[in-house]
Amino acid sequence: MFSKPLQTIYTVSRLNREIRALLEQGFASLVLTGEISNFITPASGHWYFSLKDDKAQIKAAMWRGNNRNQSYRPINGAQVTVKARVSLYEPRGDYQLIVEHMEPAGEGQFKQEFDALKMRLAAEGLFSSVYKKPLPQNINRIGVITSATGAAIKDILTVLKRRAPQLEVIIYPAMVQGKDAHLQLIKQIELANIRSEVDVLILGRGGGSLEDLWCFNHEQLARAIFNSQLPIVSAVGHEIDTTISDYVADVRAATPSAAAELVSPNTQELHNKVTQLVNRLANAFKHDMSEKRAQALQLQHRLNLCHPRNQLNQKAQRLDELSIALQQAMRNSLYQQERTLNNLTPRLMRQSPDKKLTQASHQLAQLQTRLNQAIQQQLQQANNSLALQASRLDSVSPLNVLARGYSITKTDKQKVVKSVADVKVGDTLITELVDGTLHSQVLS
């Protein structure tokens, strides 16, 4: 029976290998649905499980390289849809599925509906940034549309109490899951707009499956969000969850807690910022006052140097010096005359001529008179010169010039304006009058 020369003899390994090749070629890619059972995850990171329906089951494996990119983690009893190829585990001869992608059953239909609605609303412009309303600068009252007993409202209130306990919160309770949940959400958005009692709305809930979050993908809700006069922050699910509400809302927050942080100022940060600004303003004021005080002292010093009183004081000092010198010269002259007289007296006494004595006495009296006249003349000339200099100084005094109706015009850099060429349109001018200053601007 086994001696026919054309009969091929297989080994078990060869048979399993060729069956494997046939299976992988014939069923290279297929999509099927079933229930997960016997799900295990060994240390290797691969997933091993069975996929079954009410009449049959098949073993399946999903390698770590594929399952680590999955956002969905299956559990026993879950209905799933998988994309896989058929293969054979050669050592045992078991045929199995090699799964490349997995999602909850029905999620594929949800995704198709989601993508179709997203494209249509985007084409209408509902997601455009042109229509996004900015959050108010000063928020005093916040409205929250969510379940009154869910985790989302607890997270929001916790964050607001920590960051800005002074803010008021108004809760608009609504279902956030189920067939008619979107209708309640729409009703509360419209109610908040009618009451107009809050500055901003937070629309959200905690995480969940795609089916749990589906009410936030409803077209009617998207249009209600778009038509809202109040700015809306969408905070649905976790950071990896994205809904139509997120796209159409004015602002999207990754989580309800993140939404609370977006709409609430950090009181301590604001206090620190105000303190810094006040300190900077005070320092700038002190610095400016110090500079102005130094400038005023410099101007006062310059005015003192130019004041006519100082000029008069200098001339008076010079007059005193001349008077002292003249008196000294007079004393010296008298001293010399006395010496001469003293020298002549013995000679006269020796000659004893009365006539010469009388003449000498007369000459002496004349000389004394002339000397006194010369002294008075010198003093009168000095006084006249001093008066003349004082009059000249007084006539050219800046204060007297200003008193006659004249003025001095300077730029804001204290440069005296002598010609129209010294200024240009827009310059600030300072005009000094006898009783104050005027500030003006060059117009033409």
Swiss-Prot record:
- Enzyme Commission numbers on file: 3.1.11.6
InterPro entries the record matches: Exonuc_VII_L, Exonuc_VII_lsu_C, OB-fold_nuc-bd_dom
Gene Ontology annotations of biological process type: DNA catabolic process
Subcellular localization: Cytoplasm
What does it catalyze? Answer: Exonucleolytic cleavage in either 5'- to 3'- or 3'- to 5'-direction to yield nucleoside 5'-phosphates
One GO term describing the cellular component: exodeoxyribonuclease VII complex
Q: Any idea which UniProt keywords this protein has?
A: Cytoplasm, Exonuclease, Hydrolase, Nuclease
For the keyword Metal-binding, the answer is no
Q: What does this protein do?
A: Bidirectionally degrades single-stranded DNA into large acid-insoluble oligonucleotides, which are then degraded further into small acid-soluble oligonucleotides.
Its assembly, as annotated, is: Heterooligomer composed of large and small subunits.
Q: What family does this chain come from, according to its entry?
A: Belongs to the XseA family.
What's the protein here called?
A: Exodeoxyribonuclease 7 large subunit
